[in-house]
Amino acid sequence: MTPQALGAAFAVGLVLAIVLFVLVTNYNAVMALRQRIDKAWANIDVVLKQRHDQLPALVSAVRGLMAFEQEVLTEVARARAAYSPTEPIPEQAVHAQETTRAVRSLFAVVEAYPQVRSDRNVLDLQDEIERLESMIADRRELYNDQVYRYNARITTLPTSLLASMFGWQPRPFFAARPEEVERPATDL
C-alpha cells in the first residue's frame, strides 16, 4: 500500500469515526433528555395522585356544611374520576387542569360559607391541597423545561437528522390554561 493510499484510508477512517462519534453522542443526549422528561412527568404524577387521594376527604368535609352547593361538589368528583394515570401524558395533563379548575371553584364557593371557612378539617385539607397545587406547578415548570430542551435538540442539526431517522416527535408541554395564570384568593 502506498503512503498516499494509506493517508487517504486514514483520513476516511478518521472522518467516519468523527461522524459516528457525533451521531452516538447526539443519540445518547436525546435518550437522556427523553428519560428526564419521563422522570419529570412521573414526579408530577406522584403529586397528582396525592391530590387525587385528598379530594374525597375535602368533598366529604365540605358536603355536610354546604348542602346547597352540590353542583360544585359534583364537578370536583367528576374531574377526579376523569383522571387516569394510564392515559397518554397530554390527556393526563388536561384532566389534571380540569381538576385544578374544579378545586378552585370549590374554594371560591367555600368563601361564601362562614361555617365552612372556620372548620378546622376543611382548613387543613385546603392547606394540603394548596401545597400540592404549588408542588404541581413547580414540577410542571421542571417538566416543561425538559420538554423545551428535548424539542430544541431534535429540531436542530445534526440531531434533527437522527430525529427523522428514528421518528422522534416533539413532546407536548404541560401548559397552563388562561384561567390558571392568575390564582384566585382561597383564604378561609
Where are these regions (language model features)?
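A helix-centric hydrophobic-segment signal that preferentially recognizes long
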Residues: 2-188
